[in-house]
Amino acid sequence: YVNAAKNADATEADADVVIQVAVPAQTTVELCSNEAQAILSKENCIAIFGSNQTAAEGVLAANANLNVLGSDAGAGDVIGVGFDAGSIIKAAVQDGTFIGAVTQSPLMMGYYAIYALTAAANGQELEDVPTDGYWYDSTNMDSEEIAPNLYD
């Protein structure tokens, strides 16, 4: 840890793992790609996560230039994971560029949105509503639980 953690005197060079977060000024695929290229170009980068559809597509765009993503970490591949289920992300999961991704349930998100709107219209107090996320990879994309949640 560094900065207000276990060893505040530690440096990045002392760390076994460095978690780097990059947020572009605007959320476009191009700007996310620039940030992802900077991370993927680092020596010893072992994994990258695109935290939404635009960021995940940015990671894939960066990989088009660098060709470092894959599923064999032992062979030096950088492990890529995305969040969402657009056609570009699904194709990357299918072909092994991403090892998988997390998707949401659009049906349940819509259900809870209507539930919350109705409650608000009736003057009821609203609370946070948790929504499920589902891991998918090339082995379960066609399953009954996952397939309905893989939207474009």
Model regions and ranges:
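Sec-exported extracytoplasmic/periplasmic mature domains
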Residues: V2-A10, Q37-N44, Q53, L60-V68, ...
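Hinge/cleft segment of the Venus flytrap/periplasmic-binding protein
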Residues: N3-N7, S105-D152
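Hydrophobic alpha-helical
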Residues: P24-A91
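Alpha-helical scaffold segments in soluble metabolic enzymes
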Residues: G58, A92, Y112, A116
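Flexible loop/hinge segments that line or gate small-molecule binding clefts
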Residues: G86-Q94, F98-I99, T139, E145-A147
